[in-house]
């Protein structure tokens, strides 16, 4: 990256004239005169060639004017030019390396997995039923079951807190974490006996949920016409599933249709 020093008032007053086209300067001081340089050590007064013009007046000139002056002076110090040839833009290109100092550009590389968005974590409280209208109920503290509820038994239905996690905004799959509210029991996917298995884990409410959850807690939610599916992020193509039979455990399955139900409806809970 090229850097140019800021012009001081003394330099500005020394180098600039009132006429914008007078970007010519003499080497002998602040008197207004014109001088032609045939050689760095041998100058003579002529009416052609590169000329320097000095002015006492301080003007609010742009950086472009100042750079033009500096470039011209550096050119005169290092290179002699025939008076018969006017100074061209191409003549200044070779001088830039003498005036500008290159600085390295340091690019910091970030790990996408370590980056966490500053936006607050969003969540909602809800209840789920499978497409056969079976509700999800917490059974024996650490097991979810799906069964039909009637009358007062409806209160047994588990209330979930669904937290929306950081993920790919361009994907139609929304990463979420599912927690049984007031129990801090999170649905997670682990490998047991060589098979992906759904289980409940109790987590510290002071730490969880967080924007970047461990992969076993992440489910990719898809929704089509208010029908939801929850695919395990840890085990792709494995879904939260229920059996068509009554009061069976909720499990992780990789079969859509048949005896496995992977479609759910959701209702908000106050």
From Swiss-Prot:
Main location: cytoplasm
Quaternary organization: Monomer. In its precursor form, weakly interacts with full-length MEFV; the mature cytokine does not interact at all. Interacts with integrins ITGAV:ITGBV and ITGA5:ITGB1; integrin-binding is required for IL1B signaling. Interacts with cargo receptor TMED10; the interaction is direct and is required for the secretion of IL1B mature form. Interacts with HSP90AB1; the interaction facilitates cargo translocation into the ERGIC. Interacts with HSP90B1; the interaction facilitates cargo translocation into the ERGIC.
PROSITE patterns, per the entry: INTERLEUKIN_1
UniProt organism field: Pusa hispida (Ringed seal)
Compartments reported by the entry: Cytoplasm, Cytosol; Secreted; Lysosome; Secreted, Extracellular exosome
Keyword check for Secreted: yes
Keywords: Cytokine, Cytoplasm, Inflammatory response, Lysosome, Mitogen, Pyrogen, Secreted
Misc remark: IL1B production occurs in 2 steps, each being controlled by different stimuli. First, inflammatory signals, such as LPS, stimulate the synthesis and promote the accumulation of cytosolic stores of pro-IL1B (priming). Then additional signals are required for inflammasome assembly, leading to CASP1 activation, pro-IL1B processing and eventually secretion of the active cytokine. IL1B processing and secretion are temporarily associated.
The family this protein is said to belong to: Belongs to the IL-1 family.
Name listed for the protein in its UniProt record: Interleukin-1 beta
Prosegment location in residue numbers: 1-118
Pfam families: IL1, IL1_propep
Superkingdom as given in the UniProt entry: Eukaryota
Site (Important for interaction with integrin): 173, 181, 183, 192
GO cellular component, one term: cytosol
GO process annotations (BP): cellular response to lipopolysaccharide; cytokine-mediated signaling pathway; fever generation; immune response; positive regulation of cell division; positive regulation of immature T cell proliferation in thymus; positive regulation of T-helper 1 cell cytokine production; positive regulation of type II interferon production
Main function: Potent pro-inflammatory cytokine. Initially discovered as the major endogenous pyrogen, induces prostaglandin synthesis, neutrophil influx and activation, T-cell activation and cytokine production, B-cell activation and antibody production, and fibroblast proliferation and collagen production. Promotes Th17 differentiation of T-cells. Synergizes with IL12/interleukin-12 to induce IFNG synthesis from T-helper 1 (Th1) cells. Plays a role in angiogenesis by inducing VEGF production synergistically with TNF and IL6.
GO molecular function: cytokine activity; integrin binding; interleukin-1 receptor binding
């Amino acid at each position: 990256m090229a850097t140019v020093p800021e012009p001081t008032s003394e330099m500005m007053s020394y180098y600039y004239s009132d006429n914008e086209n007078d970007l010519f300067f003499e080497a002998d001081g602040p008197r207004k005169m014109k001088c032609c340089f045939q050689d760095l050590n041998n100058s003579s007064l002529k009416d052609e060639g590169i000329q320097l013009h000095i002015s006492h007046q301080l003007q609010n000139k742009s950086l472009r004017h100042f750079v033009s002056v500096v470039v011209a002076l550096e050119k005169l110090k290092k290179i002699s030019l025939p008076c018969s040839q006017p100074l061209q833009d191409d003549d200044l290109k070779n001088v830039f390396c003498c005036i500008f100092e290159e600085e390295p550009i340091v690019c910091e590389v970030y790990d996408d997995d370590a980056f966490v968005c500053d936006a607050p974590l969003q969540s909602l409280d809800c209840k789920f039923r499978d497409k056969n209208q079976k509700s999800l109920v917490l059974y024996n503290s650490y097991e979810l079951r799906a069964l039909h509820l009637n009358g007062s038994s409806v209160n047994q239905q588990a209330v979930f807190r669904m937290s929306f996690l950081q993920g790919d905004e361009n994907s139609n799959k929304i990463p979420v974490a599912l927690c049984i509210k007031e129990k801090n029991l999170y649905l997670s996917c682990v490998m047991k006996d060589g098979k992906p298995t759904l289980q409940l884990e109790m987590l510290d409410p002071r730490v969880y949920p967080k924007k970047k959850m461990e992969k076993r807690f992440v489910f990719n939610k898809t929704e089509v016409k208010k029908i939801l599916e929850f695919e395990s992020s840890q085990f792709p193509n494995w879904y939260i599933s229920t059996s068509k039979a009554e009061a069976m455990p909720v499990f992780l399955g990789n079969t859509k249709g048949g005896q496995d139900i992977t479609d759910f409806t959701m209702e908000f809970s106050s």
